[in-house]
């Protein structure tokens, strides 16, 4: 609460969620971006970040012909949608050759949000930017002191750090990611938030149950998905083959989680998407093929499921601002 009051005292209109006491939010205003200066083409991911107020970093730039440091610039995506404007902090040669640092300092964006990642509250580990559904998924897992918790898909460690926080840093939290660079980034994040009693393992967690003797009280499965619930989006290029392949991929993590968790232990499956093949399809697989028992995914914060009798929880992008799915299982 002290952090919230500090931010409010400096003009931030901070609100608090009643259902999740650690969740604070800022109202978002949409505005029109006008074209001025040199056009800068950004990839979709960078453009979506700029659209929400982030600065444009050099790795996200695809083209910036004629740009010099100090020039006005307008950032657009590959379809010509204007997402933000500001001042170039590097020239074309430096941006495209070195791929480091801020390319365009954004002064106006489509959605007006302050650059919180550059604030002193963020740098000192007092705040972290995370979606409400992601926080709910951690509450559904219900981490307790002395638990052994495995996060099979930990990068970038947003949920992992929150699990540490919810257990007062007393649970042993083990995070897996197959990419060593990502685990190092996760470590930086966990250190910034002053997390303790955690372990990061660079390993393909689909095979964690075969390669490690670790046994967990609780397992979080938050695998790669089609991401169709992420908002705002500038474009969607997902195919049915993508949906089917990712659903099959997710089932591999559920199989590993089932082997890792102790009898009577908890598995939470969460994805930031809305397809039935991934969400409910993975639930059916977990019950019929893995023998898991689905239980209520509480606390209920999302607007509801496709089936009113379902035990899982859905967030609707139209009603809740983002699409998300959470299911909770017990291993008998």
Indicate where each model-derived feature is located:
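S-adenosylmethionine
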Residues: 1-332
């Amino acid at each position: 609460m002290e952090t919230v009051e500090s931010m409010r005292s400096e003009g931030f209109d901070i609100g608090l969620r009643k259902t999740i006491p650690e969740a604070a939010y800022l109202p978002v205003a949409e505005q029109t971006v006008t074209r001025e200066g040199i056009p800068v083409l950004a990839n979709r991911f960078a453009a979506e970040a700029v659209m929400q107020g982030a600065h444009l970093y050099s790795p996200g730039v695809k083209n910036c012909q004629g740009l010099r440091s100090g020039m006005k610039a307008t950032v657009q995506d590959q379809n010509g949608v204007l997402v933000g404007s500001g001042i170039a902090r590097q020239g074309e040669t430096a941006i495209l050759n070195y791929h480091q640092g801020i390319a365009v300092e954004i002064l106006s964006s489509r959605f007006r949000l302050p650059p919180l990642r550059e604030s002193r509250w963020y740098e000192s580990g007092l705040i972290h930017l995370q979606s409400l559904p992601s926080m709910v998924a951690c509450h559904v897992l219900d981490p307790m002191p002395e638990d052994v918790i495995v996060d099979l898909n930990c990068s970038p460690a947003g949920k992992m750090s929150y699990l540490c926080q919810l257990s007062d840093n007393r649970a042993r939290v083990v995070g897996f990611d197959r990419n060593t660079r990502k685990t190092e980034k996760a470590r930086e994040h966990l250190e910034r938030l002053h997390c303790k009693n955690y372990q990061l393992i660079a390993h393909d967690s689909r095979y964690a149950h075969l390669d490690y003797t670790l046994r967990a009280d609780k397992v979080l499965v938050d695998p790669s998905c089609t991401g169709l619930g992420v908002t705002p989006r500038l474009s969607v290029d997902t195919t049915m083959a993508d949906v089917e392949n990712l659903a099959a991929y997710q089932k591999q993590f559920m199989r590993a989680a089932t082997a890792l968790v102790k009898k009577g232990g908890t598995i939470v499956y969460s994805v930031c998407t809305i397809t039935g093949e991934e969400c409910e399809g993975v639930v059916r697989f977990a019950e019929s093929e893995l023998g898991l028992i689905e239980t209520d995914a509480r606390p209920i914060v999302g607007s509801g499921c496709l089936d009113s009798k379902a035990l899982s929880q859905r967030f609707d992008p139209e009603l809740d601002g983002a699409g998300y799915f959470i299911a909770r299982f017990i291993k008998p």
